[in-house]
Regions:
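Short, well-structured N-terminal submotif of metal-dependent ribonuclease cores
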Residues: 1-51
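Short secondary-structure boundary segments
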Residues: 21, 55, 124-126
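Short, active-site-adjacent cap segments at secondary-structure transitions
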Residues: 24-25, 59, 128-130
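Residues that scaffold the ATP/ADP-binding catalytic core of kinase and kinase-like folds
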Residues: 26-28, 64, 132, 144-145
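PIN-domain endoribonuclease scaffold, especially VapC-family toxins
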Residues: 42-96
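Active-site neighborhoods of divalent-metal-dependent phosphate/nucleic-acid chemistry enzymes
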Residues: 85-121
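Acidic, PIN/NYN-like endoribonuclease modules and their adjacent C-terminal/linker elements
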Residues: 119-122, 126-155
Length: 155
């Protein structure tokens, strides 16, 4: 996987995002790379989105993407996770209180996103997170990229 250096889009600054594992899974299942989850991952690969992570997120990526039911090639999983580690930012969690999470394993993504000003959390499962403007679907992230004048991210 080729990865570009982070870019700034039309002077609007870098885009930082914690990316939920379901977005990676969905992108790897997209055969033509034009799905919104694929566009989000392509934006990471092109340096348009800087991923935020911590050791728990990386561990979850490896665990979930390596499950036999998905049949993803180990070298593809290693390559994708390596891009997140090499070009992302290892980010501490910001503890949150008084928020409800139906799946406690998702809290780490929320807390990592909360640790960086103006960061997003990109997920295919909005119902797993509090309703906040920074918690967005892959489709919404693609719209954000379009509004910032990001060149094609499907290549």
């Amino acid at each position: 996987m080729q990865k570009s250096k982070p870019q700034e889009m039309n002077g609007k600054g870098k885009i930082y995002a914690a990316i939920d594992t379901n977005v990676l899974v969905s992108s790897l299942f997209s055969s033509d790379g034009t799905s919104n989850p694929s566009k989000v991952i392509n934006a990471v690969l092109k340096g348009i989105i800087t991923p935020l992570y911590n050791s728990e997120i990386i561990e979850e990526y490896r665990d979930v993407l390596s499950r036999a039911k998905f049949r993803f090639r180990p070298e593809l999983v290693d390559s994708l996770v390596s891009v997140f580690v090499e070009y992302g930012i290892d980010t501490p969690r910001t503890s949150v209180e008084n928020e409800y999470f139906p799946d406690i394993d998702d809290i780490v993504f929320y807390e990592v996103a909360m640790s960086v000003d103006d960061a997003y959390l990109v997920t295919g499962n909005l119902k797993h997170f509090p309703k906040k403007c920074f918690v967005v679907t892959p489709s919404q992230m693609v719209e954000i990229l379009d509004k910032r004048g990001v060149p094609s991210i499907t290549d």
